[in-house]
Design a protein with these regions (language model features):
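Short alpha-helical segment of the dimerization/phosphotransfer core of two-component systems
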Residues: 20-28
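Conserved micro-motifs of the catalytic ATP-binding
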Residues: 43-48, 87-90
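Conserved catalytic submotifs in the C-terminal HATPase_c
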Residues: 49-53, 71, 76-86
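A conserved beta-strand-to-alpha-helix junction within the catalytic ATP-binding
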Residues: 49-67
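Short helix-loop "hinge" at the ATP-lid/N-box region of the Bergerat-fold HATPase_c
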Residues: 106-107
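Short conserved segment of the HATPase_c
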Residues: 138-151
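Conserved glycine-rich
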Residues: 177-178
């Protein structure tokens, strides 16, 4: 027959439900925050406070934030930067968010055990910051499709995320008079 649930079993079950609700509400809040930021960035309704930013320092700090996660996934990070300081006029918060979104994308979709290349190039006039990695999934979509909001490759549907990261990164880059291009070649992903 049926056995009655003890008080401790009921408490355990309720505690598990509460944890699930909390996790789901955090995901929903992140989605709403990302949507709001994407909307503001796309429409130009996001404040931009340009200042002189040291790209090398900012990129190194952002890469440092991902060091443990990359290590857990056996990703080897190779950073190549000019010896001289590379400075740009940008909003440091927005540039940080661009780096964070791109590194988070790499963490989620890079082939475990592969290399991640972060390059800063400066030709005297333009500064290029290049993120390159091998994808764990076939890159069957065009770069334009990958930049669209809510777009995620079919093979990555089971991964955490809402498909806004690249779209936000592109909008924030353009908002600061920059340009972001995605290049795919087989399983090579380059921004």
């Amino acid at each position: 027959g049926l056995t009655a649930e003890t008080d401790s079993e009921k408490e355990q079950r309720l505690s598990e439900y509460a944890e699930v609700l909390l996790r789901q509400s955090k995901k929903l809040k992140k989605l709403l925050d990302d949507l709001l930021e994407a909307s503001k960035a796309t429409t130009g309704n996001l404040e931009v406070h340009p200042e002189v930013c040291d790209v090398s320092v900012l990129l190194s700090q952002a890469a440092g934030e991902y060091e443990q996660r990359f290590s857990d996934k056996k990703l080897e990070t190779i950073v190549k930067q000019p010896e001289e300081t590379v400075k740009v006029m940008a909003d440091g918060r927005h540039l940080w968010r661009v780096f964070d979104n791109l590194l988070n994308n790499i963490y989620k979709y890079a082939q475990a055990g592969s290399r991640v290349y972060l390059n800063v190039e400066h030709d005297g006039q333009d500064v290029r910051i290049i993120f390159r990695n091998m994808s764990a999934f076939p890159l069957e979509m065009s770069p334009e499709e990958l930049e669209e909001r809510f777009t995620r490759g079919d093979k990555s549907r089971h991964m955490e995320g809402n498909g806004l990261g690249l779209s936000i990164a592109k909008s924030l880059t353009e908002l600061q008079n920059g340009d972001m291009q995605i290049v795919t070649d087989g399983d090579l992903f380059k921004v």
